[in-house]
Amino acid sequence: MSQEVIRGIALPPPAQPGDPLARVDTPSLVLDLAPFEANLRAMQAWADRHDVALRPHAKAHKCPEIALRQLALGARGICCQKVSEALPFVAAGIQDIHISNEVVGPAKLALLGQLARVAKISVCVDNAHNLSQVSQAMVQAGAQIDVLVEVDVGQGRCGVSDDALVLALAQQARDLPGVNFAGLQAYHGSVQHYRTREERAEVCRQAARIAASYAQLLRESGIACDTITGGGTGSAEFDAASGVYTELQAGSYAFMDGDYGANEWDGPLAFENSLFVLATVMSKPAPDRVILDAGLKSTTAECGPPAIFGEPGLTYTAINDEHGVVRVEPGAQAPDLGAVLRLVPSHVDPTFNLHDGLVVVRDGVVEDIWEISARGFSR
């Protein structure tokens, strides 16, 4: 991943295979393979146990190498949130991709049609006008696409919340050229971060009841509803066991982050931190304060500042563009100048989008660098 920016001067990669973790240039995004692989196995086993397909969400990582490993363990396909985001995954040979979002605009619809010609693509709709646009785009591209009617199961974002409209959209999708009605998108994003397990369980039950009622309405009207897709890392335990969902769209489970870490995880499903931002102590201006070289351009903070892994006496207190201010708590030892620390991002999805590559390590030794090739693909 070296890049020549001036003749004869190249930006070197952050690490080489065989390098110890302490030699990785910082700031860098690092994946620890042992907990990562354990997380993949745990979620796949949970889905298999409940006879639910796993369709991991690639918006979490934007990295085809990760998606390929999820598929190798048994995932049915993947989700992407934007049409452009799907491009690198199709290029990597992934053939079953659900765009878990509405697609609006001529350029994006044309791209959707191109992708649907070379891969099995599905997309969400929640209004008749957009459904007609998708149909026209598929006809122009000479393609077919599965459409799922998105229903609002409690988040209050996109999605239909009216029986008559759900039925009308499903009927319209059956009749229009270029599209096939495939089922329902029923995702509740807010519940993923409800802190107590009991609260998540109750809201998931409510969401499942809403999704089931729409599916029953369709079936009673003679319309098959083969797919009900949704769920996430925080709700997977309950969604899989509900008997309603046919697919789970969890993504962050592979990595975990500070926000998910704040949830109560005392049930049968739990995951480990596998993703870190590596940072170096660049300054020690006071006995109780050190400065790191990783700030907002290395890890996002909309869910709070990152945590410092394995260092309970160090607290990341302020985040700037390229600096992180760390308080050394009373009684704790300040790290040395040049010391390398592991940060746990508070939100993995946008943190991945800040990096070009992922340094992959096992037992503290670099194995590879994986390209985050869908970084910035947000159209």
UniProtKB/Swiss-Prot annotation:
Binds 1 pyridoxal phosphate per subunit. Coiled coil: none annotated. Inhibited by the carbonyl reagents hydroxylamine, phenylhydrazine and semicarbazide. Inhibited by the chelating agent EDTA. Inhibited by the sulfhydryl reagent p-chloromercuribenzoic acid, and by sodium cyanide. Inhibited by iodoacetate, Ag(2)SO(4), HgCl(2) and CdCl(2). Competitively inhibited by beta-hydroxyaspartate and O-phospho-DL-threonine. It comes from the Bacteria. Keywords: Lyase, Pyridoxal phosphate. CDD domains: PLPDE_III_LS_D-TA. Its EC number is 4.1.2.42. Stable below 55 degrees Celsius. It catalyses: D-threonine = acetaldehyde + glycine; D-allo-threonine = acetaldehyde + glycine. One of its GO terms (molecular function) is D-serine ammonia-lyase activity. Its cofactor is pyridoxal 5'-phosphate; Mn(2+); Co(2+); Ni(2+). Pfam families: Ala_racemase_N, D-ser_dehydrat. One of its GO terms (biological process) is D-amino acid catabolic process. Belongs to the DSD1 family. PANTHER family: D-SERINE DEHYDRATASE, ZGC:162816-RELATED. This is D-threonine aldolase.
